A protein has these predicted regions:
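Nucleotide/phosphate-binding catalytic cleft detector across ATP-hydrolyzing
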Residues: 1-66, 200-201, 205-213, 306-312
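A glycine-rich phosphate-binding loop feature that marks nucleotide/adenosyl-phosphate handling sites
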Residues: 70-72, 171-181, 231-242, 291-302
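Structural signal for terminal/edge beta-strands and the immediately following C-terminal loop/tail
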Residues: 282-312
């Protein structure tokens, strides 16, 4: 029955864990193989988030932990041994390179690291598949575009170099200091790479990241408001994108709460780790089934404070 998909919040047809023969899922495995599906938490906070909880164990922490899995929807978990909250924020695809003028997926040739000299305003970059910075005489990589981590770093570096104002405007007056600032209709752009492929950061690019960051930040701020928290003991960034973000730039752009950099941890594929734990450990399966029942689901779409934080 697809009717529940036409209303928000979406009602889950199944939210409990499933244990069934693999043949029931048409998996080409031994006829005696069993399949296990972790429980879902809410409509946009699925079994992958349950696996992240199993991997990172926030429910066993005495201090509050914030877990963020950044994607087209950011899944957010906040809490400790006393209380767990979970929500999803519609960040969109900008963090993954979509909606960015020179954006692309993380692949060889994509810029993943950026530094801008605050005096000369000249950039240097590193690309996937090459260990050298572009100012190294031996650098000969083909530069093809900007992946997610590169987008975050170049905007963070532009902020540090004062090429971007506090409200996210590329400062046209900086054109007097560098030819890399170019007029584009009524806005300006910054030329990051001027090779066979010209790569610029435009005002629209910054706006796209601002919107994505705004949705992400509104999500964890909402959960912190509900939990009555001002700080957390650690922030865990999970998923492929989270594993490649430099914590410094995540903090510069306000993607994570302020705090010591060492408290921001890249967990990598935490969902995969949790899935493997559930695969081989019956006690882990029982544990996560019990924990998920206690998670408080927060629907950002119906929370007025989410919109307030997003606008801020």
């Amino acid at each position: 029955d697809p009717a529940p998909l036409g209303a928000a919040p979406f009602a889950l047809a199944i939210d409990e864990a499933m244990h069934l023969p693999a043949t029931a899922l048409d998996l080409n495995l031994n006829s005696g193989a069993q399949a296990y599906v972790l429980p879902c938490i809410a409509g946009h906070v699925g079994a992958d988030t349950a696996a992240v909880i199993l991997s990172e164990q926030p429910h066993k922490s005495e201090e509050p932990v914030l877990i963020i899995d950044i994607g087209t929807n950011a899944e957010i978990v906040l809490g400790d041994s006393k209380r767990l909250l979970a929500a999803s924020s519609p960040t969109g695809p900008a963090f993954e390179g979509a909606q960015i003028s020179a954006g692309q997926r993380a692949a060889p040739g994509a810029i993943e690291r950026v530094r801008i000299d605050p005096e000369t305003l000249e950039p240097k970059v590193k690309v996937i598949g090459n260990d050298l910075w572009s100012d190294d005489p031996a650098f000969d990589a083909q530069v093809t575009g900007l992946c997610g981590s590169g987008i975050i770093e170049v905007i963070g570096e532009m902020v540090l170099a004062r090429l971007v104002t506090a409200d996210g405007i590329i400062d046209g007056e900086m054109a007097s200091r560098t030819s890399r600032i170019e007029a584009s209709d009524r806005t300006f752009s910054y030329t990051l790479w001027d090779g066979a492929t010209k790569i610029q950061v435009t005002q629209d690019d910054i706006r796209a990241i601002q919107l994505a960051k705004g949705a992400l930040t509104a999500g964890w701020r909402l959960l912190m408001d509900i939990a009555g928290l001002q700080t957390v003991s650690r922030t865990v960034l999970s998923g492929a994108f989270g594993a490649h973000i430099d914590p410094l730039y995540a903090m510069i752009l306000g993607m994570v709460p302020d705090g010591p950099l060492e408290t921001i941890i890249a967990a990598g594929n935490a969902a995969g780790t949790g899935a493997r734990l559930a695969l081989v450990n019956g006690a882990a399966r029982r544990e996560i089934e019990d924990v998920v029942r206690k998670v408080e689901k927060i629907e950002t779409a119906t929370e007025a404070k989410f919109q307030d934080h997003f606008v801020d």
